[in-house]
């Protein structure tokens, strides 16, 4: 690796940590526990470079209870300002996380048909177009005389220039049938959400801590040492600064 490449690598590495620092010191009001969490993940012991690029060893790191760390972060999300703004929301609003996604602006995921249908089922104003048949099982039915109205509203929600028809919307529903997200029931204009979709769109999924935990910590992974992370950082950090002191 040439000196120029080494400099670029070192600069890119420092830039990455600068971005992390900027994100962790913004204008948001963090809880004390969450600030402790940020301090933990940003903790980096100082290591001096030596004459060998491969001789750098990480300093001894204490072993942390990773569930406690994750819990601190979760408390920020679920017990801070976000939770306070959601705790008084009615069921009709709570089951519509897609609405929050839409407000994010550029770069946000587009609203999908199954999300729109699920949202409409909890909207009293849409009761004349779509209704639950068995809410617990996720079975719903389009109202025959107003199915075209529902399709038209869906097209407008998507931002289509041409008018959306029920026939086109039904074609999309058949595609969901192939993937298993929504299946057709042997009853006129009746469909069923899959269990996975119901869980994904449920309030408990939107606000539950357990899902947050399960994505970060495996059941048998009670404790996690930060040695590996620090080793990677120390190796690059020390090598970069050592190489900067060598004449190219």
UniProtKB/Swiss-Prot annotation:
* Domain of life (superkingdom): Eukaryota
DNA-binding feature ranges: 111-194
| Cellular compartment(s) | Nucleus
Expression (tissue specificity):
Preferentially detected in fetal and adult spleen, lymph nodes and at lower levels in bone marrow and fetal liver.
- Note whether Hydrolase occurs among the keywords: no
List where the protein spans the membrane: none
Designated name of the protein? Transcription factor Spi-C
Gene name?
A: SPIC
